Amino acid sequence: MSKIIIATANKGKAKEFEKIFAKFNIEVATLADFPEIGEIEETGTTFAENAALKAETVASVLNQTVIADDSGLIVDALDGAPGVYSARYAGIAHDDAKNNEKLLKNLEGVEPDKRTARFHCTLAVATPSEKTSFYTGEVEGVIAEQLCGTNGFGYDPLFFLPEFGLTMAEIPAEKKNEISHRANAIKQLEKDLAEVVEKVTKK
């Protein structure tokens, strides 16, 4: 089985990548498998900058092809916030409860038809001495007025999908892995996936 490295320490993201890549018979390794690398500070101002920073840093250290993603929630009524700061929106990295609480507070009084939003994902594929490639995916939704569902992570309990009548945290994981922003970005990557896997297996 081929193995590919995903430059993330986020367990929720890692689990999604594992399930999505499993259908291609590709095993996933993450930064949890390489503790010596440590945390990579996301200093970019765009999803692409942060994804490239993570992928290129890890590719350089391990001397092989690496995929990284940077993703987040874009809320129209908040001028695109939380955006690249989604994970640390409330000031503490990866505190889902605090982030959701702040999002609801900032949207108090906003009418349902004005609560449109989208999850965005940019994938960066970095290979030492080669130009980094980018793939993007999005999924459209509306921010609910209260938390619903226990599946998923992050803003999933607030991200309402009108076509399903459910939040992202209420739909089965299998369905989420078909329609999510991350899944849509990987669909864009699919056309080049054989080439990426070939680079990995050469190492």
Curated annotation (Swiss-Prot):
Positions bound to substrate: 8-13, 71, 153-156, 176, 181-182
Species for this entry: Listeria monocytogenes serotype 4b (strain F2365)
Cofactor details (free text): Binds 1 Mg(2+) ion per subunit.
Name listed for the protein in its UniProt record: dITP/XTP pyrophosphatase
One Gene Ontology molecular-function label: metal ion binding
EC annotation from Swiss-Prot or TrEMBL: 3.6.1.66
Residues noted as binding Mg(2+) in the record, renumbered to the chain: 41, 70
InterPro entries: dITP/XTP_pyrophosphatase, ITPase-like_fam, RdgB/HAM1
Family the UniProt entry places it in: Belongs to the HAM1 NTPase family.
Catalytic activity: XTP + H2O = XMP + diphosphate + H(+); dITP + H2O = dIMP + diphosphate + H(+); ITP + H2O = IMP + diphosphate + H(+)
Cellular component terms per the entry's GO annotation: cytosol
PANTHER family (alphabetical): INOSINE TRIPHOSPHATE PYROPHOSPHATASE, INOSINE TRIPHOSPHATE PYROPHOSPHATASE/HAM1 PROTEIN
Self-association state and partner proteins as the record states: Homodimer.
Function as written in the Swiss-Prot or TrEMBL entry: Pyrophosphatase that catalyzes the hydrolysis of nucleoside triphosphates to their monophosphate derivatives, with a high preference for the non-canonical purine nucleotides XTP (xanthosine triphosphate), dITP (deoxyinosine triphosphate) and ITP. Seems to function as a house-cleaning enzyme that removes non-canonical purine nucleotides from the nucleotide pool, thus preventing their incorporation into DNA/RNA and avoiding chromosomal lesions.
NCBIfam families to which the protein is assigned, alphabetical: PRK14822.1, RdgB/HAM1 family non-canonical purine NTP pyrophosphatase
Active-site feature positions: 70 (proton acceptor)
Pfam families: Ham1p_like (PF01725)
BP GO terms, sorted: nucleotide metabolic process; purine nucleoside triphosphate catabolic process
Keywords, in A-Z order: Hydrolase, Magnesium, Metal-binding, Nucleotide metabolism, Nucleotide-binding
Reported cofactor(s): Mg(2+)
